[in-house]
Amino acid sequence: MVTWYGAAKHEYRLTRFGHDFPFLNADMVGDLLVLIPKSLNDFIAYVLDYDEDIEELQSALGVESFQNWGVYQNGVARKVESEDECVDRLIRESFGAFGDFPSGEVFSETARQVLQKCLRNFSELPPDEALMRSIETEYQLFQFVERVVCQNLVAGRLFKDIDEFIQTALSILNRRKARAGRSFENHIEYLLTQAGIPHKMRPALGADGRPDIIIPGEKAYFDLSWPEDKLFVIGLKTTCKDRWRQVLNEGRRVQAKHVVTLQQGITGNQLKEMQAARVSLVVPRSLHNKYPEDWQPALLDVQGFITNVKQRLASATN
């Protein structure tokens, strides 16, 4: 049953599953539930488990489901709360005249500029909140530009054959997949720079691979006199139920790794695996309540991670 809690919570809830409902168990934490209406009272439900399946669906529909649920119609989110008028206006002013997609860096920088103009205290926000606001606003920017550019590309067009149609569709899907990861990387890099933390994005470490970030940089990594506990090898994963293991083979000089993620919860068993592998999870504070309650104290938020890094680097130079 779907129930509207308007007075207190201002949200819908799915209720009355019963104690023997097969999906009410800890192993399903972080999965994606998709409901497709057949009629007003009859829905088809899909539960997606693997990262690849979740990202494939989101890319195909042109949606992103981090932080909250959403209702989508014709690929456009129908939000319960109205969009901020200032953000909406600046999005249109920034990209209304674009005939093609700008670079990922331009998207990210523009999103932050919009927030700086529309939110009086944006520069004072904690890193966790600044990260989530920036990612959400950039997603709005991307949606607007995609409609402007791709609508002209496909609306009313007669494709000469199936291959041309598939090629066009794949181009749109691949752009959506790549954009989310680049957005995440760009905003994390900005936060590190703002915090004054030296770092290198995607350094080439030879046989030790190419991690997403190394702190303070390659020179310190290859300097065997530099203390290992003052080195940080970081993986950036928008989803990490499976992909967190990739960081284990990167920057192998550093045994204790960090993974920064937007993953909305994973199981206690997976968190035990991470702990055994000496991988610390860094999750924006607003997403901590998506994780098993007994594991939440073990999670780092972005602010805590930045503080920890700065303290360790400061002791290395003293």
Where are these regions (language model features)?
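Charged, structured surface patches that assemble and position nucleic-acid processing machinery
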Residues: 1-11, 26-44, 48-76, 271-318
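Polyanion-binding interface signature
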Residues: 1-24, 217-218, 222, 232, ...
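Catalytic micro-motifs at enzyme active sites that drive phosphoryl/nucleotidyl and oxygen chemistry
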Residues: 18-24, 33-34, 201-203
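Short, glycine/acidic-rich beta->alpha junctions
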Residues: 25, 141, 145, 155, ...
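Glycine- and charge-enriched low-complexity intrinsically disordered segments
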Residues: 66-116
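Interdomain/boundary linker segments immediately adjacent to catalytic/signaling cores
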Residues: 94-182
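Acidic-basic catalytic patches of nuclease active cores, encompassing PD-(D/E)XK
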Residues: 161-209
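Catalytic core segments in nucleotide and nucleic-acid processing enzymes
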Residues: 189, 199-318
